[in-house]
């Protein structure tokens, strides 16, 4: 799997922050401690969704559906998962995807490293990849 590329919504090394979960590394450590495995991006995005709903209910100061919907539509915040801002159609338009590359050390231990966008990269993309005969 070394050198394989994969797009994802989130990685624990991204430097987004919030007041509840703090950052991705803190979230991942707490998740690992609780569930005994690393959090997939789906868990992170679900946790961030709860922060968005909490914020919307507080700004709406109501459980009225229209007020909550309007508060959600006006959301513009950062969470440990990333920036959250909704377009008129409901899509989050303020959070880019990330690209991983599988990188292995000399012992054979492999892990995903963020290689793009460069603003969030934790490693440099290896391309072109070495020929099979050079590995």
Describe each PLM feature range.
Residues 1-12:
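Extracellular/periplasmic bilobed ligand-binding domains
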Residues 2-3, 36, 61, 82:
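Glycine-centered flexibility sites
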Residues 10-14, 45-49, 105-106, 120:
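Solvent-exposed loop/turn segments at secondary-structure junctions
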């Amino acid at each position: 799997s070394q050198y394989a590329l994969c797009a994802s919504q989130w990685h624990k090394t991204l430097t987004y922050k919030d007041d509840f979960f703090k950052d991705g590394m803190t979230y991942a450590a707490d998740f690992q401690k609780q569930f005994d495995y690393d959090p997939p991006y789906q868990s992170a995005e679900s946790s961030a969704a709860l922060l968005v709903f909490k914020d919307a209910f507080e700004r709406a100061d109501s459980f009225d559906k229209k007020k909550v919907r309007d508060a959600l539509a006006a959301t513009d915040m950062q969470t440990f998962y990333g920036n959250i801002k909704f377009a008129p159609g409901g899509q989050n338009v303020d959070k880019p995807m990330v690209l991983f590359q599988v990188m292995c050390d000399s012992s054979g231990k492999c892990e995903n490293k963020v290689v793009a966008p460069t603003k969030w990269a934790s490693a440099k993309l290896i391309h072109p990849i070495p020929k099979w005969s050079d590995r």
